[in-house]
Curated annotation (Swiss-Prot):
GO biological process, one term: DNA repair
Cited function: The RuvA-RuvB-RuvC complex processes Holliday junction (HJ) DNA during genetic recombination and DNA repair. Endonuclease that resolves HJ intermediates. Cleaves cruciform DNA by making single-stranded nicks across the HJ at symmetrical positions within the homologous arms, yielding a 5'-phosphate and a 3'-hydroxyl group; requires a central core of homology in the junction. The consensus cleavage sequence is 5'-(A/T)TT(C/G)-3'. Cleavage occurs on the 3'-side of the TT dinucleotide at the point of strand exchange.
Enzyme class: hydrolase
A Pfam family the protein falls into: RuvC
PANTHER family assigned to the protein according to its UniProt record, in alphabetical order: CROSSOVER JUNCTION ENDODEOXYRIBONUCLEASE RUVC
Subcellular compartments: Cytoplasm
Residues that coordinate or bind Mg(2+) 1: 8, 139
Species, as recorded: Pseudoalteromonas translucida (strain TAC 125)
Annotated protein name in UniProt: Crossover junction endodeoxyribonuclease RuvC
Binding site for Mg(2+) 2: 67
HAMAP family cross-referenced by the UniProt entry: RuvC
Length: 174
């Protein structure tokens, strides 16, 4: 079973979700949030890095998946989100994990089947896919959704590669 660490980055709260998958079967391993709210920004970045490092040591994931930056209404918010992502990605890079990035639309499409789904729909589907007894907190659910999205992306690439008989100009052809 492949273990995936999914991260929903944030400068005040960073969600994480860990799942194992084999084929279409998922196993929930853990989720939660790295709480950062009451610290100076540079300390929060350090806490993200340290939190990611601890999660990698605890769960030994084989891959790391993270949400891409979206353009917020406030440019300062987008910059802080980018820095939070950077701190998380460095944690993965220091552990030599491959890093995969997905947009919010890709994640929602993979988990809910609708790229415009809202947070409650994502939480509901994550709960159902992973057969959780309760609804996960929003940031943890988003991180689990990122991990599920990555698993689906891997499965689709494997199917595509298996169905291709040759390549033409670098593209797979049947």
């Amino acid at each position: 079973m492949a273990i995936i660490l999914g991260i929903d980055p944030g400068s005040r709260l960073t969600g994480y979700g860990v799942v194992a998958h084999q084929g279409s079967k998922f196993t929930y391993l853990g989720s939660g949030c790295i709480k950062l709210a009451d610290h100076e920004f540079h300390i929060r970045l350090k806490m993200i890095y340290q939190g990611i490092t601890q999660l990698i040591e605890q769960f030994s994931p084989e891959t790391f998946a993270i949400e891409k930056v979206f353009m917020a209404h406030n440019p300062d918010s987008a910059l802080k989100l980018g820095q939070a992502r950077g701190a998380a990605i460095v944690g993965a890079a220091m552990a030599d994990l491959p890093v995969f990035e997905y947009s919010a639309r890709q994640i929602k499409q993979a988990v809910v089947g609708n790229g415009g789904a809202d947070k409650t729909q994502v939480q509901h589907m994550v709960k159902n896919i992973l057969k959780l007894p309760g609804t996960p907190q929003a940031d943890a659910a988003d991180a689990l959704a990122i991990a599920i999205c990555h698993a689906h992306s891997e499965q689709n690439l494997i199917k595509l590669a298996g169905s291709a008989s040759k390549t033409v100009r670098g593209r797979l052809r049947k």
